[in-house]
């Protein structure tokens, strides 16, 4: 076992002395050392209850012959970080999570890991660490929040963001909004729709890295604690079998993940996180393959924000396992991939079934024939851009409009709130990419405000930044190359015509080649490129992040240092 490096032999007496200072017995020292990564924080509703989950995990480890060691890592709440400079740090925190786990696992020679995330960037950060370290590892999250109830309807955090738009449009008053905000988030857990956190927790099941139920058992259910205890027990089985993350997450596994992504209508952020996870396992990722999977994978679930149906309803309908079983029976996923259950995906799914066909529809009656996400290519995005087509009224939507260009989110948000944006406009928010932001901020404020104003089908929003899983409407993100790298989005001016064809997967700037080349020359001649950032954001971690981060088309993963 790895931990023998720090506890066996005469030369390790000092190490054993320090371990005994922790109160460990010789019996405990003789057992495998299992790291339990607790991302508890009092700042994040999705993580506020993780101490209890962690205790259940440790009980399961002890029950099956291991010695657990709890340590912590950071967690950022994207909702609280939204709409101000804090959002620069959200995506960038993913790499800190992965690095912190690497440091602790390597520094203390741990034998296996149980990873306990909940929210947006913590889930992929932990999966990236698992792939990088490649020691036995398993994930159990904190689970989704239950929805609130307001005016007789289920509500989630996205309802509040869209409520802000209703107030700005004069449709509602502040007293109404104040009442809504008090009822939208009634429990602990990750926000209650198919937003980024729940998308990634569901996909963790699809990737085989968590036990069934991880993505959907509500945070407040005792069933979540049972799952945590079983997860702690199961990590010891993984250790004994020497079953590692790279044995589980393969090219076929990732393709399964994309299929489930399409069937569930997950967040566009998954298209950043899946390639970053693949990168850590040295697995090739082709963004264009997403459309191949989407074309043949119907969307069979439609959860908030695409509908009012909360994530908890998916659990009652049969959970991710029921969705996987549908896809397996239709030949849309590979059932031979391994899982942390110690059996193949097909074996794990043999008893899975759909309980509610209104929530998980049959393949013969999907919500749409294509999957929930679409990658767009064209002269504005030769490396790709992404839209959540499952949240549109039609997956063959065509939109042509005039650009309103903003260098950064703040002036765009002000223009929307000041009612300067009209039907037929294409709001372009640039210099918000991984490098240009830096940190690729989410644009939930602008998209939710437009939705609240009733403009989400009449105004497009185009950015080299990204969107919250709670965003809907004509929201196109991850435009690559980004403006800071000289992508054509940097050349746009107010009034330029932009055409979006969802059915054909195209994003085009309608411009002559002569005009485009003239714009390119003007851009190249600019002594100082547009930069809306405060100088302090280039210092510290964000400065280092901006230096190493790659394109969104590569998952905004950091460049590896060359020897």
Curated annotation (Swiss-Prot):
Name the Enzyme Commission number(s) assigned to this protein: 4.2.1.9
Q: Where does [2Fe-2S] cluster bind?
A: 119, 191
Q: Which Gene3D superfamilies match?
A: IlvD/EDD C-terminal domain-like (3.50.30.80)
Instruction: State the protein's purpose.
Output: Functions in the biosynthesis of branched-chain amino acids. Catalyzes the dehydration of (2R,3R)-2,3-dihydroxy-3-methylpentanoate (2,3-dihydroxy-3-methylvalerate) into 2-oxo-3-methylpentanoate (2-oxo-3-methylvalerate) and of (2R)-2,3-dihydroxy-3-methylbutanoate (2,3-dihydroxyisovalerate) into 2-oxo-3-methylbutanoate (2-oxoisovalerate), the penultimate precursor to L-isoleucine and L-valine, respectively.
Q: In which pathway does it act?
A: Amino-acid biosynthesis; L-isoleucine biosynthesis; L-isoleucine from 2-oxobutanoate: step 3/4; Amino-acid biosynthesis; L-valine biosynthesis; L-valine from pyruvate: step 3/4
Any one Gene Ontology BP term: isoleucine biosynthetic process
Task: Name the chain's protein.
Answer: Dihydroxy-acid dehydratase
Using the record, list the residue span of the signal peptide; answer none if the entry has no such feature. Answer: none
């Amino acid at each position: 076992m790895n931990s023998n490096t720090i506890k066996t032999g005469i030369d390790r007496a000092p190490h054993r002395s320090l371990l005994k200072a922790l109160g460990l017995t010789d019996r405990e020292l003789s057992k495998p050392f299992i790291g339990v990564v607790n991302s508890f924080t009092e700042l994040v509703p999705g993580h506020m209850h993780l101490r209890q989950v962690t205790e259940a995990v440790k009980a399961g480890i002890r029950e099956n012959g291991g010695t657990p060691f709890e340590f912590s890592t950071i967690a950022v709440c994207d909702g609280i970080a939204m709409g101000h400079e804090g959002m620069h740090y959200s995506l960038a925190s993913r790499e800190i999570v992965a690095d912190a786990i690497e440091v602790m696992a390597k520094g203390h020679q741990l034998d296996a890991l149980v990873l306990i995330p909940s929210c947006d960037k913590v889930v992929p950060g932990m999966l990236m660490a698992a792939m990088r370290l490649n020691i036995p590892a398993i994930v159990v999250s904190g689970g989704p929040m239950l929805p609130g109830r307001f005016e007789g309807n289920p509500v989630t955090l996205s309802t509040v963001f869209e409520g802000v738009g209703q107030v700005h449009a004069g449709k509602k008053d502040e007293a109404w909004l104040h009442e809504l905000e008090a009822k939208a988030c009634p429990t602990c857990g990750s926000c209650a729709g198919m937003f980024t956190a729940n998308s990634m927790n569901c996909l963790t099941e699809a990737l085989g890295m968590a036990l069934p139920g991880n993505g959907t058992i509500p945070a407040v259910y005792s069933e979540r604690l049972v799952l945590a205890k079983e997860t702690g027990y199961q990590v010891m089985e993984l250790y004994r079998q020497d079953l590692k993350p790279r044995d589980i997450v393969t090219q076929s596994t990732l393709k399964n993940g994309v299929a489930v992504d399409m069937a569930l209508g997950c967040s566009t952020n998954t298209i950043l996180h899946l390639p970053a996870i693949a990168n850590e396992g040295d697995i090739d990722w082709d963004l264009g393959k997403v459309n191949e999977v989407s074309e043949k994978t119907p969307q069979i679930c439609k959860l908030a924000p695409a509908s009012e149906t909360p994530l908890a309803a998916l659990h009652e309908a049969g959970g991710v396992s029921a969705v996987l079983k549908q896809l397996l029976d239709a030949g849309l996923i590979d059932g031979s991939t391994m899982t942390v259950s110690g059996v193949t995906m097909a074996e794990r799914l043999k008893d899975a079934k759909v309980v509610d066909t209104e929530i998980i529809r049959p393949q013969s009656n999907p919500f749409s024939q294509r999957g929930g996400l679409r990658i767009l290519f064209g002269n504005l995005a030769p490396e790709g851009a992404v839209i959540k087509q499952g949240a549109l009224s039609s997956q063959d939507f065509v939109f042509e409009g005039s650009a309103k260009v903003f260098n950064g989110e703040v002036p765009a948000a002000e223009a929307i709130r000041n009612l300067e944006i009209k039907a037929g406009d294409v709001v372009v928010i640039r210099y918000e990419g991984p490098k240009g932001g830096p940190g690729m901020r989410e644009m939930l404020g602008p998209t939710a405000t437009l939705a609240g104003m009733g403009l989400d089908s009449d105004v497009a929003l185009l950015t080299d930044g990204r969107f919250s899983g709670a965003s809907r409407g004509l929201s196109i993100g991850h435009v690559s190359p980004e403006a800071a790298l000289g992508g054509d989005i940097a050349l746009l001016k107010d009034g330029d015509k932009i055409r979006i064809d969802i059915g054909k997967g195209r994003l085009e700037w309608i411009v002559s080649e002569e005009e485009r080349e003239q714009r390119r020359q003007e851009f190249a001649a600019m002594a100082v490129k547009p930069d809306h950032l405060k100088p302090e954001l280039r210092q510290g971690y964000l400065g280092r992040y901006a230096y190493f981060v790659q394109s969104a088309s590569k998952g905004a993963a950091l460049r590896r240092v060359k020897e």
